[in-house]
Regions:
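N-terminal helix-turn-helix
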Residues: 17, 22-70, 258-309
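C-terminal all-alpha effector/ligand-binding and dimerization domain
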Residues: 172-241, 255, 415-457
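Conserved amphipathic alpha-helical segments that form helical-bundle/coiled-coil interaction surfaces
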Residues: 118-168, 204-212, 356-414
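Short helix-adjacent coil turns
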Residues: 22, 27, 115-119, 128-134, ...
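Short, cationic-aromatic polyanion-contact patches
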Residues: 4-13, 32, 66-83, 247, ...
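Ordered, small/hydrophobic-rich secondary-structure cores
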Residues: 1-20, 26, 87-189
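Conserved segment of winged-helix/HTH DNA-binding domains
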Residues: 74-110, 160-161, 313-352, 404-407
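Extreme N-terminal segment that seeds HTH/winged-HTH DNA-binding domains in transcriptional regulators
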Residues: 1-38, 223-269, 330
């Protein structure tokens, strides 16, 4: 179980939205702490931190030994105003979000269901038969938890929070869900999982998701008036939540510039002062960032000479990454988790992207990859493809998700030269085998036939 203050803030926001939509009303009891721990895959300390903040802000009352009780009240007019503001900001983005998460999260769902045993399916069957929309959330949480990838769980909850799910079954006599249809779709999904049939799982989940999204959009379009003056709220994947990693994000930008940007043909980085000017940060922040890169083994600070770039060098330096540093281990965990998400989703995302790119964009990408082959820098082709998709995809949410995954995945690239020295425990503790890093589907985004067609067109 994770103990994460940033996730506590997500849980806080999750319940605030639930209160405003009257999913939980005045006098209702919240689920017990152990239930919430299982639902969010976090420790009791994280849940208690979220509940403490809800109590301090007057949303709930807590009494030792009893479930928290809802104190929040609002008038019907306040509910209507909140719903109009909430959905008017998101209406245009909802189809994009559903399509994007279908491409990224659904492959993980398929993999999870194929790993389940009969005991797991018994749990899912019990959840599927419950009419409460909250149990549908627990249904999909239980599935995703099977792959033990905190990053996909984070993405699931962030997208759920953006959509305001789950909604109450009814609002003012208007039914949002057909629970009979939903239960039938979930039973079909369980049957496909029992059969270990990835294609059936994919289609069953897609049918459920499209039913729900159609019902939600139909309700919004029928009940929420258009607000032309309200700007669309973009989906932002808050991987770090309220714990901004300034040096971490800056280190990712430096690694990007070494592989794909201004520093790719340099032996030494520019001075701290020049780097600070380029990235718009203080010199002290830049020094701390280089310190992180030194600990990673990506760079080496040499007195009187500057900061040497090691990540592209094949020569022996006597320097190895310090994987005992908590920040480095955390970022390596993000690398492994993003690696899995990219490996499982890249085929579908790339197929969609190639179909929607303009002729000029397809030519630009082809020329980029041909250039890497000619100058023998083909090892960065996957990263350049991910970056290209993050910049040019027609789906805003894919731009956001792949932009974040690209950055997190960069943490692993400087490790290539140290792969033999990487301790096995950092892999095993995240559910991977050491050979996983050298046999990734990310390096075969397209089949040979697809690649040939791409370059011929």
């Amino acid at each position: 179980m994770r103990n994460d203050e940033g996730f506590a803030n997500l849980i806080y926001e999750y319940f605030v939205v639930r209160f405003h939509f009257q999913y939980y009303k005045y006098g209702d009891s919240l689920p017990k702490i152990d239930t919430l721990c299982r639902q969010f895959s976090v420790s009791s300390l994280t849940i208690k931190s979220a509940l403490k903040r809800l109590q301090e802000d007057g949303y709930i009352h807590r009494c030792h030994g009893r479930s928290a009780q809802v104190l929040f009240r609002q008038s019907d007019r306040e509910l209507d105003d909140y719903a109009v503001r909430f959905f008017s900001k998101r209406r245009a983005m909802i189809p994009d979000l559903y399509q994007s998460t279908e491409l990224v999260v659904l492959p993980m769902m398929v993999k999870s269901l194929c790993q389940m045993d009969e005991q797991d399916f018994a749990v899912l069957t019990r959840l599927a038969e419950q009419p409460d929309p909250e149990d549908q959330m627990r249904f999909f949480c239980y599935i995703l938890q099977k792959v033990q990838n905190p990053l996909v769980m984070n993405l699931f909850w962030e997208s759920t929070l953006y959509l305001g799910l789950p909604f109450p079954m009814e609002n003012k006599g208007h039914r949002l869900y057909d629970d009979g249809t939903s239960q039938r779709r979930l039973r079909e999904l369980i049957a496909a999982g029992r059969a270990k049939n990835p294609a059936r799982i994919y289609e069953a989940h897609l049918a459920f998701q499209r039913d729900v999204s159609k019902q939600i959009l139909s309700y919004i379009n029928a009940r929420i008036p258009e607000q032309p003056d309200i700007e669309t709220l973009p989906f932002v994947w808050k991987v770090y939540r309220d714990r901004p990693e300034i040096c971490g994000n800056l280190a990712i930008r430096v690694i990007h510039d070494v592989y794909l940007g201004d520093f790719r043909d340099m032996e030494f980085l520019p001075s701290y002062e020049k780097l600070a000017g380029k990235y718009g940060v203080s010199v002290s922040t830049m020094r701390r960032t280089i310190g992180v890169l030194n600990q990673l083994g990506a760079t080496q600070s040499i007195n009187g000479k500057g900061t040497r770039i090691l990540m592209l060098s094949d020569s022996e330096t006597g320097q190895t990454p310090d994987l005992t540093v908590p920040k480095i281990r955390r970022n390596m965990a993000y690398y492994l988790q993003s690696f899995e998400l990219l490996a499982d989703s890249c085929k579908g995302v790339m197929r969609m992207a190639l179909q929607t790119f303009s002729d000029a964009q397809r030519t630009e990408l082809a020329d980029l990859l041909k250039g890497y082959l000619q100058n023998k820098r083909y090892y960065i082709s996957p990263q350049s493809i991910f970056a290209f998709v993050a910049e040019h995809s027609l789906l805003q949410v894919i731009q956001e998700i792949y932009g974040k995954l690209y950055g997190l995945n960069l943490w692993g690239y400087p490790m290539a030269k140290y792969r033999k020295e990487m301790p096995k425990d950092i892999l095993v503790e995240h559910g991977y085998e050491p050979e996983d890093l050298s046999s990734s589907p990310s390096f075969s985004l397209l089949s040979t036939e697809e690649a040939a067609r791409f370059f011929q067109e």
